[in-house]
Amino acid sequence: MHCVPLFCFLWFCHHLYYSQAVPIRKVQDDTKTLTKTIITRINDISHMYSISAKQRVTGLDFIPGLHPFQSLSDMDQTLAIYQQILSNLSSRNMVQISNDLENLRDLLHLLGSLKSCPFDEAGGLSALGNLEGVMEASLYSTEVVTLTRLQKSLYVMLQQLDLIHGC
């Protein structure tokens, strides 16, 4: 008689434990799919390849470089910086990629909330300040360097999404 409530409780706990794993996997898969979509969009922009990756462009130090991500929050902060830079570029392609980055950041936040991870505010945004002067002086170079670095960061992010099990 006492076993029935215990069995029901254990069944309920078992159901809760396994029901959470499915949404996390789905959100993670959606995150990877959107990341691949953004990479494909960047590949489709043909003018990106007209500047060598080895060529140095001065004055664009505000664009994040390639670095490993330690957490979902790191990914979000880097994407927030790229999103702000792209939103200042007027090309139609940049608007689409910026919107995709916003959706990707939303997925990262959802993934973080499912894993009970705290997210820091995107601190690098205030350091960007007013980009209009730099953008006017070298709009094309800014676009090319931003897309090149974003694409490399997305590849790293794609590889590390499976490796980040905690926050």
Swiss-Prot record:
Please give the GO cellular component terms listed in this UniProt entry.
Answer: extracellular space
Q: Where in the cell is it found?
A: Secreted
Gene Ontology molecular function terms on file:
hormone activity; peptide hormone receptor binding
The signal peptide, as residue positions, is 1-21
- Give the UniProt keywords, A-Z: Disulfide bond, Obesity, Secreted, Signal
Does the keyword Iron feature in the UniProt annotation?
Answer: no
Presence of keyword Secreted? yes
A biological process from GO = positive regulation of TOR signaling
- The record lists its disulfide bonds as C117-C167
What's the family? Belongs to the leptin family.
Query: So what does this one do?
Result: Key player in the regulation of energy balance and body weight control. Once released into the circulation, has central and peripheral effects by binding LEPR, found in many tissues, which results in the activation of several major signaling pathways. In the hypothalamus, acts as an appetite-regulating factor that induces a decrease in food intake and an increase in energy consumption by inducing anorexinogenic factors and suppressing orexigenic neuropeptides, also regulates bone mass and secretion of hypothalamo-pituitary-adrenal hormones.
Q: What is this protein called?
A: Leptin
Organism this protein belongs to: Sminthopsis crassicaudata (Fat-tailed dunnart)
Q: Which gene encodes it?
A: LEP
